[in-house]
Amino acid sequence: LILPFNPRKASGFREGSLQMAPRVKLRLLEGTYGVARLSADASIPAWADGTGFLSISRTDDELSVVCRQERIPHDVKADTGWNCLKLQGPFAFDETGIVLSVIEPLSTNDIGIFVVSTFDGDHLLVKSKDLEKTFELLANAGHSCI
């Protein structure tokens, strides 16, 4: 099955309007984050819980934990040095183009990103070394960081 790609829908274009998806406010969360990888059969670690953003995902291949990096033990495989920006929602599940409008200016400028979605919103993680450039690119795209 091959589905046609509609770039107007993906970009947030609205029929009858030349407007793009709504501009998004993003809030920088305190702290620096890490993404830890555990074996697929690992128990959810107690060290993951605490202040700040936390996301735990399990697949057939792994258990991933996103949390403040100071909580990740040194003997756990992890990629650290991420900052977390929360897209100020909530956004409806059927609202299209929101995340794309934020990640497009970053990915086209070689900024590596990691997005985690929750029921009420989305969280964008960018490397700390790219944070200043991220703010600049998002502002140029019409978004605001608070």
Range-by-range predicted roles:
Residues 1-19:
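N-terminal amphipathic/basic-hydrophobic helices that include classical n-h-c signal peptides
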Residues 2-4, 87, 124, 132:
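Generic hydrophobic-segment detector
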Residues 7-10, 76, 108:
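A generic alpha-helix propensity feature with a strong bias for hydrophobic helices
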Residues 16-105, 133-146:
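Regulatory modules associated with amino-acid/nitrogen control
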Residues 90, 95-129:
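A structural feature that tracks compact, well-ordered secondary-structure segments
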